[in-house]
From Swiss-Prot:
<protein>
    <recommendedName>
        <fullName>Putative defensin-like protein 23</fullName>
    </recommendedName>
</protein>
<keyword id="KW-1015">Disulfide bond</keyword>
<keyword id="KW-0295">Fungicide</keyword>
<feature type="disulfide bond">
    <location>
        <begin position="54"/>
        <end position="78"/>
    </location>
</feature>
<keyword id="KW-0611">Plant defense</keyword>
<feature type="disulfide bond">
    <location>
        <begin position="31"/>
        <end position="80"/>
    </location>
</feature>
<dbReference type="GO" id="GO:0005576">
    <property type="term" value="C:extracellular region"/>
</dbReference>
<comment type="similarity">
    <text>Belongs to the DEFL family.</text>
</comment>
<dbReference type="InterPro" id="IPR022618">
    <property type="entry name" value="Defensin-like_20-28"/>
</dbReference>
<feature type="signal peptide">
    <location>
        <begin position="1"/>
        <end position="25"/>
    </location>
</feature>
<dbReference type="GO" id="GO:0031640">
    <property type="term" value="P:killing of cells of another organism"/>
</dbReference>
<keyword id="KW-0732">Signal</keyword>
<dbReference type="Pfam" id="PF10868">
    <property type="entry name" value="Defensin_like"/>
</dbReference>
<keyword id="KW-0929">Antimicrobial</keyword>
<feature type="disulfide bond">
    <location>
        <begin position="50"/>
        <end position="76"/>
    </location>
</feature>
<dbReference type="GO" id="GO:0050832">
    <property type="term" value="P:defense response to fungus"/>
</dbReference>
<feature type="disulfide bond">
    <location>
        <begin position="41"/>
        <end position="66"/>
    </location>
</feature>
Amino acid sequence: MTTTMKIMSFAMLLVLLFSIDVVEGSGSSLCCNTHAKFGACNTYQDRKRCNKWCLDGCDNKKGGFCKRFAGGAKKCHCYC
């Protein structure tokens, strides 16, 4: 019975591993990246502009947000 349980557990693990949806980001794409070249990302208008910039530039159409970094700096980051 323990051998059967081990085989079933291994089979279930394989099913889970192969069913995971992998998202890749490429360096030249806006998606999944932070963009310092976007400029300031401090006000509500900047957040709206960042979101629109990512919506227009990413194929996934998920938008973006102003991500906080060390020192309190915020930069535009597009969702994966």
